[in-house]
Amino acid sequence: MADSSESFNIATSPRTGSRRDALTSSPGRDLPPFEDESEGMFGDEVPREEEEDGEELIGDAMERDYRAISELDRYEAEGLDDEDDVEDLTASQRDAAEQAMRMRDREMGHELGRMRRGLLYDSDEEDEDRPARKRRMAERAAEGAPEEDEEMIESIENLEDMKGHTVREWVSMAATRLEIYHRFKNFLRTHVDEHGHNVFKEKISDMCKENKESLVVNYEDLAAREHVLAYFLPEAPAEMLKIFDEAAKEVVLVMYPKYDRIAREIHVRISHLPLVEELRSLRQLHLNQLIRTSGVVTCCTGVLPQLSMVKYNCNKCNFILGPFFQSQNQEVKPGSCPECQSLGPFEINMEETVYQNYQRITIQESPGKVAAGRLPRSKDAILLADLVDSCKPGDEIELTGTYHNNYDGSLNTANGFPVFATVILANHITKKDDKVAVGELTDEDVKAIVALSKDERIGERIFASIAPSIYGHEDIKRGLALALFGGEAKNPGGKHKVRGDINVLLCGDPGTAKSQFLKYVEKVASRAVFTTGQGASAVGLTAYVQRHPVTKEWTLEAGALVLADRGVCLIDEFDKMNDQDRTSIHEAMEQQSISISKAGIVTSLQARCTIIAASNPIGGRYDPSLTFSENVDLTEPIVSRFDILCVVRDTVDPVQDEMLARFVVGSHIKHHPSSKDIANGEEFALPNTFGVEPLPQEVLKKYIMYSKEKIHPKLNQMDQDKVAKMYSDLRKESMATGSIPITVRHIESMIRMAEAHARMHLRDYVVEDDVNMAIRVMLESFIDTQKFSVMRSMRKTFARYLAFRRDNNELLLFVLKQLVAEQTSYQRNRYGAQQDTIEVPEKDLVDKARQINIHNLSAFYDSDLFKMNRFTHDVKKKMIIQQF
C-alpha cells in the first residue's frame, strides 16, 4: 500500500523533473502501465469511461504536491500589478464605476451577452433534448417568433426591478419574456379555487369539447397569484397577451397534443378587469393600454377575411416569399426577392396565405348612463378570431380590449392637421343579458331549482314574486308569470308554425302601476326590450333600411320586435300609437316574423317574442258600464291577438285603500330604514296577498331560464272535452254580451297557458290542474272585459271554474264584500250618507256560501284575512260588522 502511495505521489506531482519535461510530457507517462486496466488505485474498480476524464489527483499524500521547489517556482512578472501603487476605490467611486459598466453592457445589447454565454458550451456536445428543441424552434419560426435558446437566456429572479426601463421595453426583452412565459404557464397549471379544484384544467377541457380557441382568465385570480404579471398586463397588453397565448397553447397541447389541428392558436381572454372606463372618458393616456368599457352595439359589419400570415409570389422567378405576419397598425410587404434580387412586382399567394376573421362594430353609451342634456358617444371596436358574431345590434355588452390609434386621412382633411382615429381591439366580450345564462348555472343552482319545483305552493310563490312591491292585482301577476314562462311553439310537419309565446294587454285607469309591471318584467326577463307607443314608429318596431356609413350599401337594421327575439317586448302607452304603426305588428304578434321588401332587400326577420303592452282607456278612465271594445281605441284584430286581457279599475274601497296606503308607507320605511330601526335589528315584512313567501329576484330569473330551456311539456294527458265545452260556453256568452269576440285563437291561448303552468312546475306533461288554471285565467280575463251589469251573472255561471285553486277564505271574503257593497248602497240611498259601520246578517253569507259548497264558516271568522279587512262576528246578534 505504501508503494502504491509512493507511486501515486510521483505520478501525480507536476513539479518532478525539469520545467521542460513538466511542460512537454504528461504526468505519469514514465510510470509502468497497470496490468489490469480495470484495476485502479487502492484496488478499486474504475469505469472505463473515466479514462478520458484525466487522472485522479486527490489522495492521502496530496500535500506533497504543494511543497516548495526553488528551481521550478519561477513565474513571469509581465502583466502583474502587485507592485504598482494603486489607490483603493471609495464606495462612491466603486458605485459610479459599476453604473458605467452596467450602462456599457446595456448598450452592447443582449445578443452579445447570449453569444458570450454560448462560448462556455462545447460545440461538440449533443444535448439530450436536441430533437424536442429543434421541433420547438421550428414551431416558433413558423409562428414568426424569434429563435431563442432558453438555456442561453439568463433567468430573472426579481421581475419587479425594471432597471429604469418602461414596462413595454422591459416586457419586450428576451429574459423578461421567458420569465413571464414560465410564470403564466405555472399559473395555468397550478391555480386552484377555494374548493381545491384545478380551475384551468376544467376550463381547458370545456374549451376543447366545444372546439373553441378562447381561454378566459379572471384578472382578479391573476392579481392574487401573480401580481407582477397583473401589473404589467394593462400597461403593455399587446406584448403580454402574445406571451400569454404562447403559454396557454403549450399547456393545451400538453393535455390535448393534437388540438392544434382544430385551433391553430389559443387566445387568452381577460375578464373582470377592475376599472371600468366610460366611452366619453377615454383619453390619450389610455392609448395602448388594456381598458374595460360598456355600451350598446348599434352597428355591426359582416365577417370579413383579414390577412394574418401572408406569402407572396415573385412574378419574375415564381419564388415564394414569406411568411409575413401582418399587424393591426401597418402592412408588411417584401422589399426584394431573395432569389432573383428583383424589386417586384409581387402578388399574394392565395393558397398558402392564412386569413383570420375580422368584424367591426360600433358601441354607444347606454342611455341610462348619459348625463342630462348630453348626446351619447360612440366608439368603433374590432373583433378578431372567434369573437366575431359574439354580439349583434341591440346587445348591451361589456368590452375588454386594447385602446389603439390608427391613421385616418379623412380626419386630417376635415381638421386641417394630423389627427389619429382611435379604435378598441377587443379581447373579451360579455353580454349583460347573458350574465345568468343557462350554461352558467352551477350544479347547486340546478339542484335548488329542482327542489323548489317540488314545493306544493311553488305556483303561488312565483305569482307572489312578480312585482312584490306592488300591492294586490293578483290577476295581473298571474298573467305576467304565465307570459314569462310561455307555452311550447309547434310546427307540425314543418308546414305551419304555431306560436308558443303568450301576449298580455294591461288596460285600466291611470295610477294603477301598469308601467311599473312592465319595468319589473324588463328586469326579470332574460332578454327584454322596452319601448313606448308614442315614441315608436312602425319601422322602429319592425325593421328599417339605411345606407351603411362604411360600405355605402343598403343594410337592414333591426327594430324593437326583432331585437327582442326569444325574449319579451314591452310597449307602454300602446293606445298612443298611430293606427298605421299599430297594424305593422299584426304579423309579428301571430306569425312571429316580419317581412321586409325595401330598397331591393326582400327578406323575413324572426320576431319570436312575447308582447306585453299597457294602454289607457278612452277618456282617461275605464267606464264599467261600457264593454271593453268601447273603452279602448284598439281594433278587433289587435285585441284578438292578445291571449290575456287584464282590466285594472281604481275603485273606491275604504278598507282596501287603507291597506294599500299602509303597504306603500311600509315599503318606503323598508327601503329607507332609520338608524334606530337598524340598531334594533327590526325587519319590515311587506304584507303578501298570496300568503306565501316570494322568491328572490335572482332565483326567479334562474328558475325561468332553466324551465324555458330544459322543460318542454306535452299535451298527452290533457282533458280535451273540458276545453271544448269551455270554448262553446264562451262563444255563446260573447255573442250574447257583445264584449270581445271569442275566436279559435282563444283555444290556442288556453293550451299555451296550460303549457306555461306545467312548465312553471317543471312538469313534462300537462295535467288537469294546468288546464283548470288556464281556464280560470281565461275566464277572469273574459269576465273583466264585460259590462258591470253582465259581470255578476257571468261569475255565477262560471263559479265552479273560477273557484279553482282559490282558498275558501278568499271566496267567502269576495262574497262578503259583495254583500257589504249592496248594504252600503242601500244605506246611502236611505240615509243619504255612508255610515261608519255596516252590518250584514250572517244568514245571507251562509246562504251564499252554500251555493259554492262551503258549509263551515267558523274557520273564516277566525282567519287573519277576515280580521285584516276589519270584519267582526257578533255571535249574539248573528251579524257581521265592518268598521270604516
UniProtKB/Swiss-Prot annotation:
Which reaction is recorded as catalysed by this protein? ATP + H2O = ADP + phosphate + H(+)
Q: Polar residues compositional bias: what residue ranges?
A: 1-16
Q: Where is this motif: Arginine finger?
A: 640-643
- By its UniProt entry, which InterPro entries does this protein fall under? MCM, MCM2, MCM_CS, MCM_dom, MCM_lid, MCM_N, MCM_OB, NA-bd_OB-fold
User: Where the protein is mainly located, per its record?
Assistant: nucleus
Summarize what the UniProt record says about post-translational modification.
May be in a phosphorylated state in the mitotic mcm complex. Phosphorylated in the interphase mcm complex. Phosphorylated by the cdc7-dbf4 and cdc7-dbf4b complexes.
Q: Where is the composition biased (Acidic residues)?
A: 47-58
Record domain MCM: where: 458-664
**Region annotation Disordered: residue ranges?**
1-61, 120-151
Short name of one Pfam family for this protein?
MCM_N
Q: Where in the cell is it found?
A: Nucleus; Chromosome
Check the record and name the SUPFAM superfamilies matching this protein: Nucleic acid-binding proteins, P-loop containing nucleoside triphosphate hydrolases
- Similarity comment: family membership: Belongs to the MCM family.
What is the protein's given name?
DNA replication licensing factor mcm2
UniProt source species: Xenopus tropicalis (Western clawed frog)
